Amino acid sequence: MARGIFITATGTDIGKTYVTALIIKRLRETNINCGYYKAALSEAERRDGKLIAGDANYVYNIANIKGDPNDAVSYIFQQAVSPHLAAKLNNVEISMERIKKDFYSIKNKYDYITVEGSGGIVCPISTGKEKIMLDNIIKIFKLPAIVVADAGLGTINSTILTLQYMKEKNISVKMILLNNYNHEDIIHIENKGYLSDNLLIPVYTCNKNANNLEIPVEKLIEIYEEI
């Protein structure tokens, strides 16, 4: 039975892909067969007439995953917009059946699977024939989640609002990870302290431009659940 986790964030460009890559890298360095999946990806680069799934490509390179990164993403769009809008612009109908098929195909290849979301937690994936929100994908695969937040000013508000939404959707949050953390920045220190003191969820940090996570691998293994 495979084990899985979902990586979401308090907003766009917080560092989900960066953190996702470091988590998978950490596990794979300890000989854990960990893979990657993303339902929909925007802002893909076109090379030689082919769209390249940039986020997946980054994760595969950092975590040393073999194979074609495009195979880890169900829907790849060039426009730098939300998946639902990209689908509209390209006349594409996003299907939960295809997402499920691709997810289970990836899942069958790995013992651990790390699923990356799109944007923040409130993200429409499809507003076409099927109405799909990001939380629908999390729940259909029964995945627990990690919330990535920026360490700086405003993160207390955005983190707590994100957690409240996820609680309403009955999504289990296993960890908060403050990205771009500076151990000498008083705001970062205070934010971590406040969240740690007022939440029942463990709060970890990731230093800016870090090549590795400081989180013990045992802690990472613990938060992945059977799926």
Curated annotation (Swiss-Prot):
Any GO BP: biotin biosynthetic process
**Name this protein carries in UniProt:** ATP-dependent dethiobiotin synthetase BioD
Per the Swiss-Prot or TrEMBL record, the active site comprises: K38
User: Subunit notes for this chain?
Assistant: Homodimer.
Recorded family membership = Belongs to the dethiobiotin synthetase family.
Positions contributing to Mg(2+) binding: T17, D55, E116
Q: What keyword terms does UniProt attach to this protein?
A: ATP-binding, Biotin biosynthesis, Cytoplasm, Ligase, Magnesium, Metal-binding, Nucleotide-binding
* Alphabetized HAMAP family for the sequence: BioD (MF_00336)
Q: Which residues bind substrate?
A: S42
Question: Record's CDD domains?
Answer: DTBS
